[in-house]
């Protein structure tokens, strides 16, 4: 790989570089291919934890963004090595969405001022079982006896319209980066490949990745920034080794317990 083709990993860039308005195009590209509609970022919201050290517990940035209709807010873009918090991750993102809903409506405002929330989580740990690398969750109300979807009546621009509850309730995207193991063909797949490997195809036309090739070049950082970045990568490698070792020790312990149970059953017979 040529030196100019080395790009900064997204989990690092999102905390240190992509908060700058000049770099919003990178984030907008990811959200555009994920939501399948144009997204324009209005501002980056400060997070509850902007820890910048190698032993970060969280790597979280809150993003306020509009779609092409100016209707939505992207509340949380989560890219993290959640090494000790993964057992309650769903509860954590639920809390984050609930907090965002209340933060973005003032006391005394009407219910129609409640904003649509999209929660996007980029996961570098194993959250559970599943065959896909991208999962999408949203609320639907199904008839218990009929199985039909409920349409609710509401008012928009002085007109009475019907809409699905999913258009109002939060939506969740879980990107399981480590589960992606195919050749990237679509813009979304190119993005997942970059999230996993840090590599960007030189001929990419994927929204956001074109900008990333210009703005996230490793050697554009200062020597001090490169040192901090390299330390970040080393910390990740060490943590991953610890996790792999612990997982293997757990499997070996399970195998030993199984063999011992087998011997005991044999003696009893």
Question: Model-flagged regions — what are they?
Answer:
Residues 1-269:
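Elongated, amphipathic alpha-helical interaction scaffolds
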């Amino acid at each position: 790989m040529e030196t100019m083709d080395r790009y900064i990993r997204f989990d690092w860039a999102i905390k240190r570089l992509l908060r700058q308005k000049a770099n919003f195009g990178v984030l907008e590209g990811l959200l555009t291919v994920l939501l399948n509609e144009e997204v324009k970022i209005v501002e980056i919201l400060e997070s509850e934890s902007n820890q910048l050290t190698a032993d970060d517990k969280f790597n979280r940035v809150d993003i306020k963004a509009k779609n092409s209709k100016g209707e939505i807010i992207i509340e949380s873009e989560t890219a993290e090595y959640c090494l000790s918090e993964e057992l309650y991750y769903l509860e954590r993102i639920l809390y984050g969405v609930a907090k965002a809903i209340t933060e973005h409506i003032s006391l005394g405002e009407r219910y129609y001022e409640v904003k649509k929330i999209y929660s996007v989580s980029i996961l570098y740990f194993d959250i559970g079982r599943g065959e896909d690398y991208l999962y999408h969750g949203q609320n639907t109300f199904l008839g218990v006896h009929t199985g039909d979807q409920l349409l609710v009546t509401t008012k928009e621009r002085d007109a009475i319209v019907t809409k699905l509850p999913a258009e109002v309730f939060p939506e969740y995207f879980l990107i399981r980066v480590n589960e992606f193991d195919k050749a990237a063909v679509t813009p979304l797949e190119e993005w997942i490949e970059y999230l996993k490997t840090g590599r960007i195809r030189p001929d990419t036309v994927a929204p956001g990745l074109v900008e990333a090739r210009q703005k996230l070049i490793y050697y554009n950082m200062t020597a001090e920034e490169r040192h901090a970045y390299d330390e970040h990568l080393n910390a990740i490698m060490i943590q991953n080794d610890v996790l792999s070792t612990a997982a293997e020790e757990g499997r070996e312990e399970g195998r030993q317990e199984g063999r011992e149970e087998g011997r005991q059953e044999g003696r009893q017979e």
